[in-house]
């Protein structure tokens, strides 16, 4: 199978390190998912958690979007709740709802029931990573895990929440239990990442999907130490992404991220200015723009690319996951456009943010 996959020119890893690359690398969050007919055929009715522990299915579902889209990276097919299930937490993933927990965690005794993650329970995942590294033949494999706050929110609320009110109530009213919970979750997610790294992933991404619900001061006090513990000293490039986290971008970098993922709400030139010197960013096309006519979509993709040049490095991605009704052909066209546009600019020597916007535009200011 490896002979039908594109060879990596190292663009993604170079950008993660803040080095120049011949093209802007591109991959998509949730690129392995229901937008692909081959995904639907391969997974069938297999429950999500079961699929995430089936070695051969993990391999197949991870490779499908690389074959289809010719992206610059694969991301391991999994779910952020998998290490919780492996740590003895009773949960199920309900279609259209998300993870649902039978026993919410709201007291110190509840935290004590969450076991440390045993690597022995990860055998199918570790074996899948090793097989994938061979199949991908040089294309980077991204591993991932959930950030402590987002996992805690699911556990405390018992499932997805709009306002995270129960989570915040615990955070404010019982900080000892709160910090004990996040400390345990940081250990679990870190072990999950280290097992993937030891098996061969080249990059990791930490998803803090719900951190945007927090005031920056609360993030700094109640969350940042635990995200920092999770990310500290990992021996591969680290991407940190959250939704609605425009006010947290500098802190996402400060807790240990090499690359900061940006959702579609914040222009990348603005994000680069907020993060500061040597910012490397990932994102951030609105996932819904893929349904627009091609001239509109092309203009939006080009705008993301140009704004991304205000940062030291840019990985093109969506600002959140691929929507299930997305046309795979459109994503393939985006990949081709990103590669062609950025290769041409690299060969000719950039049109900079100043060239595109003028010296008074924020993108030009961020570009310095």
Swiss-Prot record:
Record keywords: Cytoplasm, Decarboxylase, Lyase, Porphyrin biosynthesis
GO MF annotation list: uroporphyrinogen decarboxylase activity
EC number(s) on file: 4.1.1.37
InterPro entries found in the cross-reference section: UROD/MetE-like_sf, Uroporphyrinogen_deCO2ase_HemE, Uroporphyrinogen_deCOase
Highest taxon, organism lineage: Bacteria
Pathway: Porphyrin-containing compound metabolism; protoporphyrin-IX biosynthesis; coproporphyrinogen-III from 5-aminolevulinate: step 4/4
Family: Belongs to the uroporphyrinogen decarboxylase family.
Protein name, entry field: Uroporphyrinogen decarboxylase
Organism encoding this protein: Acidothermus cellulolyticus (strain ATCC 43068 / DSM 8971 / 11B)
Taxonomic lineage of the native organism: Bacteria, Bacillati, Actinomycetota, Actinomycetes, Acidothermales
């Amino acid at each position: 199978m490896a002979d039908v996959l594109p060879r990596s020119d190292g663009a993604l890893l170079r950008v993660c390190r803040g080095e120049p690359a011949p093209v802007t690398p591109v991959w998509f969050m949730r690129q392995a998912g229901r937008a692909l007919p081959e995904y639907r055929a391969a997974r069938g009715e297999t429950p999500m958690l079961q699929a995430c522990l089936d070695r051969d299915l993990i391999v197949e579902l991870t490779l499908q979007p690389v074959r289809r889209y010719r992206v610059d990276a694969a991301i391991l097919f999994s779910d952020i709740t998998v290490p919780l299930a492996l740590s003895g937490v009773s949960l199920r993933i309900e279609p259209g709802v998300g993870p649902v927990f039978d026993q919410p965690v709201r007291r110190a005794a509840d935290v004590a029931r969450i076991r440390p993650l045993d690597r022995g329970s990860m055998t199918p995942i570790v074996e899948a990573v090793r097989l994938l590294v061979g199949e991908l033949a040089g294309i980077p494999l991204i591993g991932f895990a959930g950030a402590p706050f987002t996992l805690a929110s699911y556990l405390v609320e018992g499932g997805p929440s709009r306002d995270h009110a129960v989570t915040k109530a615990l955070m404010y009213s019982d900080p000892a239990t709160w910090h004990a919970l996040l400390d345990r979750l940081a250990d679990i997610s870190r072990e999950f990442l280290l097992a993937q790294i030891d098996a061969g992933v080249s990059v990791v991404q930490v998803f803090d999907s719900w951190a945007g619900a927090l005031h920056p001061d609360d993030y700094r006090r109640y969350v940042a130490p635990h995200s920092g513990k999770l990310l500290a000293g990992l021996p591969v490039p680290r991407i940190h992404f959250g939704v609605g986290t425009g006010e947290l971008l500098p802190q996402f970098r400060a807790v240990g991220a090499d690359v900061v993922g940006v959702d579609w709400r914040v222009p990348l030139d603005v994000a680069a200015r907020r993060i500061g010197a040597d910012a490397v960013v990932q994102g951030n096309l609105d996932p819904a723009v893929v349904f627009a006519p091609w001239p509109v979509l092309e203009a939006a993709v080009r705008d993301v690319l140009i704004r991304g040049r205000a940062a030291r490095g840019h990985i093109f991605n969506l600002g959140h996951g691929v929507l299930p009704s997305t046309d795979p052909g459109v994503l393939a066209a985006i990949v081709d456009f990103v590669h062609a546009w950025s290769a041409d600019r690299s060969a000719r020597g950039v049109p900079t943010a100043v060239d595109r916007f003028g010296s008074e535009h924020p993108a030009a200011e961020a570009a310095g």
